[in-house]
Curated annotation (Swiss-Prot):
Mg(2+) binds at D16. This is S-adenosylmethionine synthase. Catalyzes the formation of S-adenosylmethionine (AdoMet) from methionine and ATP. The overall synthetic reaction is composed of two sequential steps, AdoMet formation and the subsequent tripolyphosphate hydrolysis which occurs prior to release of AdoMet from the enzyme. It comes from Clostridium novyi (strain NT). Its EC number is 2.5.1.6. It is an enzyme of class 2 (transferase). The lineage of its organism: Bacteria, Bacillati, Bacillota, Clostridia, Eubacteriales. Belongs to the AdoMet synthase family. NCBIfam families: metK. SUPFAM superfamilies: S-adenosylmethionine synthetase. The keyword Metal-binding applies. L-methionine binds at E55, Q98, D247, K278.
């Protein structure tokens, strides 16, 4: 059976992604000096203004406006004619400490309060919720092809803008890739969409020619393209007004872009601006780590891992494995393997993936998973041999 599946990505200059990067840059600045800092940092951007708000408990000082302006400058909003300028935008902050009612459950998990002395039990989940991880062998990154290609196109857009190849481009942009599948295997790319902000004087014809030559053709392998592939480059005909001047941005509003592009499920919790005691983030990373190692070990061609937690409790309340009919062994045995090989309590996840480090801003654009341009601990294939012992 043939079907089409589509995923999108956005560039670092998209207003929602700006907010994710600002929130994670503040998180990194705190973790750099206080690895045990508690951070729940949200950002909003609009024309000429940034607002940073949230709950932060730390023993270090961070110059939040300075961090905000550095991020905006790095992204490329450095001129007033872009509608947003790192030097002149206003930065408002409204920060409180983490609620003591939340902190008491995170500082000492229910298991620890009941007398269990394991150090890992001392950390309870920072909230209730469900988190999913996903992996597939259809790309070498163990990611679905549509989101994999969409992210590469978005990164290339930023690259050719920043290195001067296409100096008329501006920071905001979006990409989208539609892949045709036959019997659940990708066989071709059916459509590519690239929308990029640009200077007003450049023509649509020039943009289409340059994007095709310097972005699409350099990113998408020829074997995925054919005479029937459709290309939509700035299909509205003009994209001059963009970034926060064109749309208000918020942290956590690109959760499908951040994960698997719609392949597999999402528990709804965003990542950026959250320290690793928040299982929205750390457990989703762990679920990806589990799924990727299982697929790499040959347990299945495609796996989704579902985890659920209760606030203040260390041990997951449920573990779900879905192999979509691609399993090489029974799903029940896969669950047993996961329980033997991986410790999915928050304290163990933080320990095993070394999540108290300032590593998060680099994840806040172009996806948290399947990255080859940065080293991320949940992407390591360090459990494959151990998994194979139990197959």
């Amino acid at each position: 059976m043939r079907r089409l599946f589509t995923s999108e990505s956005v560039t670092e200059g998209h207003p929602d992604k700006m907010c994710d990067q600002i929130s994670d840059a503040i998180l990194d600045a705190i973790l750099k000096n206080d690895p045990n800092g508690r951070v729940a940092c949200e950002t909003a951007v609009t024309t000429g203004m940034v607002m940073v708000m949230g709950e932060i408990s730390t023993n270090c000082y961070v110059d939040i406006p300075k961090v905000v302006r550095e991020v905006i400058s790095d992204i490329g909003y450095t001129r007033a004619k872009y509608g947003f300028d790192a030097e002149t935008c206003s930065v408002l902050t409204s920060i409180d400490e983490q609620s003591q009612d939340i902190a008491m459950g995170v500082d000492e998990a229910l298991e620890s309060r009941q007398g269990q002395k394991d150090d890992v039990e001392a950390i309870g989940a920072g909230d209730q919720g469900i988190m999913f991880g996903f992996a597939t062998n259809e790309t070498k990154e163990y990611m679905p092809l549509p989101i994999n290609m969409a992210h590469k196109l978005s990164r290339k857009l930023a690259e050719v803008r920043k290195n001067g190849t296409l100096a008329y481009l501006r920071p905001d942009g979006k990409t989208q890739v539609t892949v045709e599948y036959e019997d659940n295997k990708p066989v071709r790319i059916d459509a590519v969409v690239v929308s990029t902000q640009h200077d007003p004087e450049v023509t649509q014809e020039q943009i289409q020619k340059d994007i095709m030559e310097h972005v699409i053709k350099t990113v998408v392998p020829n074997e995925w393209l054919d005479d029937e592939t459709k290309y939509y480059i700035n299909p509205t005909g003009r994209f001059v007004i963009g970034g926060p001047h064109g749309d208000t941005g918020l942290t956590g509003r690109k959760i499908i872009v951040d994960t698997y592009g719609g392949s597999g499920r999402h528990g709804g919790g965003a990542f950026s601006g959250k320290d690793p005691t928040k299982v929205d983030r750390s457990a989703a990373y762990a679920a990806r780590w589990v799924a990727k190692n299982l697929v790499a070990a040959g347990v299945a061609d495609k796996i989704e891992i579902g985890l659920a937690y209760a606030i203040g409790v260390a041990r997951p309340v449920s573990l779900l494995v879905n192999t979509f009919g691609t399993e090489k062994i029974e799903d029940s045995k896969i669950v047993d393997i996961v329980n033997k090989v991986f410790d999915l309590r928050p304290g163990a996840i933080i320990r095993d993936l070394e999540l108290k480090r300032p590593i998060y801003r680099q994840t806040a654009a172009y996806g948290h998973f399947g990255r080859t341009d940065v080293e991320l601990p949940w992407e390591q294939l360090n459990k494959v041999d151990e998994i194979k012992k139990y197959i």
